[in-house]
């Protein structure tokens, strides 16, 4: 920084201290300017909070949001173009229904109904994904651009104006001790900054119809989503009602138990006391199995050497997104990296991926 720049910083700091501590009066801005500044500040707060709440509305699960952010960051680091999307709750419900519907089989009314409902839930998830994309392009991105460009630029002009005001007030207080030309230049710069800040705030407030247009795009996207969702659910409801009608029209199958096979107790034998008795069944002794023997559980996967970083799975973990590593309770996983305080990266049976720290117990920690 030049000597002139250092002097200017000193002037501003000195004037600020005299106002904050000494109670000195600074140059007052007009009421119209203050009113515009207040409206811009309220607009900035409104846009920031509406953005955050909109993202929560589209992606309500905070854990999934954090996980998605982490995976997207890792994808960027690895140069992967395709990023995993937010796991919609409708899609997860649909996958669950389809899985159990297939297990129950085609002869089960409930199984067939679960398959119908599962397919509809997956369609709802696809429609929700379309809503996410539409809202991001036409509402979230424009508002973020407003925050990062227009509002940020206004804050820059206001900060510059405040600095030039402090410089002007300091020199005005020392009038007679500094050249008049220096005081005149300070006043011109202050008025110039005030005009620039005023113009930028005026332009923002006068073009707020753009934000109305973006809000309208959000509502249109929601309407389109709900229309499609209603259509999908109407179709599903009709399918289920048809299944109920078909099931009620079919004759009920009566349960017929199988005939019992006769059980032969054999001829009774007389004991010395004259009472009948039956011979107790003999238990064959075997060297390969005794009652005290217990089945030995063998690990389902190969274990890494214990001299390298590793951990043991405490619970089963089913991967939900690309890049995650699935495992079963008791598996020993080789640790390769710690992504953050909640996620590890590791290898198991030649496959690499990410998994939550809370699902494992560290056996050999990663080197610091």
Swiss-Prot record:
Phosphothreonine carried by residues: 298
Taking the first listed entry, what is the main subcellular location of this protein, grouped into a coarse class? cytoplasm
Sites bearing Phosphoserine, chain numbering: 288, 292
Q: In which tissues is it expressed?
A: Ubiquitous. Higher expression in pancreas, placenta, prostate, testis and uterus.
Q: Where is the SH3 domain?
A: 306-365
Q: Where is this region: Interaction with ARC?
A: 218-254
Locate the coiled-coil region(s) and give their ranges: 145-250
Q: Which GO terms describe its molecular function?
A: cadherin binding; identical protein binding; lipid binding
Q: Where are the stretches annotated Membrane-binding amphipathic helix? A: 1-21
Output the Pfam families linked to this UniProt entry. BAR (PF03114), SH3_1 (PF00018)
Q: Which GO terms describe its cellular component?
A: anchoring junction; cell projection; cytoplasm; cytosol; early endosome membrane; glutamatergic synapse; podosome; presynapse
Q: Which UniProt keywords apply?
A: Cell junction, Cell projection, Chromosomal rearrangement, Coiled coil, Cytoplasm, Endocytosis, Endosome, Lipid-binding, Membrane, Phosphoprotein, Proto-oncogene, SH3 domain
Question: CDD domains per the record?
Answer: BAR_Endophilin_A, SH3_Endophilin_A
Q: Which stretches make up the BAR domain?
A: 18-249
Where, per UniProt, does this protein localize? Cytoplasm; Early endosome membrane; Cell projection, Podosome
Start and end residues of each stretch annotated as Disordered: 244-308
- Compositional bias, Basic and acidic residues, is annotated for 245-263
- Site entry (Breakpoint for translocation to form KMT2A/MLL1-EEN oncogene), positions: 15-16
- Share what the entry says about its subunit structure, partners included: Interacts with ARC. Interacts with SYNJ1 and DNM1. Interacts with PDCD6IP. Interacts with BIN2.
Similarity comment: Belongs to the endophilin family.
Q: What is known of its domains?
A: An N-terminal amphipathic helix, the BAR domain and a second amphipathic helix inserted into helix 1 of the BAR domain (N-BAR domain) induce membrane curvature and bind curved membranes.
Biological role stated in the UniProt entry: Implicated in endocytosis. May recruit other proteins to membranes with high curvature.
This protein is called what?
A: Endophilin-A2
């Amino acid at each position: 920084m030049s000597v002139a720049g250092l002097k200017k910083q000193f002037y501003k700091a000195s004037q600020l201290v005299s106002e904050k501590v000494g109670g000195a009066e600074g140059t007052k801005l007009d009421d119209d300017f203050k009113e515009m500044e207040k409206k811009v500040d309220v607009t900035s707060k409104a846009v920031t909070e509406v953005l955050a709440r909109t993202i929560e509305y589209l992606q309500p699960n905070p854990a999934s949001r954090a996980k998605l952010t982490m995976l997207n960051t890792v994808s960027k680091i690895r140069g992967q173009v395709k990023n995993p999307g937010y796991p919609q709750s409708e899609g997860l419900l649909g996958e669950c229904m389809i899985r159990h519907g297939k297990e129950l089989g085609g002869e089960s009314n409930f199984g067939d109904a679960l398959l119908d409902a599962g397919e509809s839930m997956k369609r709802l998830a696809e429609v929700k994904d379309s809503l996410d994309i539409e809202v991001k392009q036409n509402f979230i991105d424009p508002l973020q651009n407003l925050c990062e460009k227009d509002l940020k630029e206004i804050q820059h002009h206001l900060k510059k104006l405040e600095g030039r005001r402090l410089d002007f007030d300091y020199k005005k207080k020392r009038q007679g001790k500094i050249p008049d030309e220096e005081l005149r230049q300070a006043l011109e710069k202050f008025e110039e900054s005030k005009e620039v800040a005023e113009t930028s705030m005026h332009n923002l407030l006068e073009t707020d119809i753009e934000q109305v247009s973006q809000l309208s795009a959000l509502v249109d996207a929601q309407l389109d989503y709900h229309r499609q969702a209603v259509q999908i659910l109407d179709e599903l409801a009709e399918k289920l009602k048809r299944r109920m009608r078909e099931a009620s029209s079919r004759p009920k199958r009566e349960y017929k138990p199988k005939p019992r096979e006769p059980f032969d107790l054999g001829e009774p034998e007389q004991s010395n006391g004259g009472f009948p008795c039956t011979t107790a069944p003999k238990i064959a002794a075997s060297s390969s199995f005794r009652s005290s023997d217990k089945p030995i559980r063998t690990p389902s996967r190969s274990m890494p050497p214990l001299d390298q970083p590793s951990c043991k799975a405490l619970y089963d973990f089913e991967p939900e997104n690309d890049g995650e590593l699935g495992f079963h309770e008791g598996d020993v996983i080789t640790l390769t990296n710690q992504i953050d305080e909640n996620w590890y990266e590791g290898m198991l049976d030649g496959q690499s991926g990410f998994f939550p720290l809370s699902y494992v117990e560290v056996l050999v920690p990663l080197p610091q």
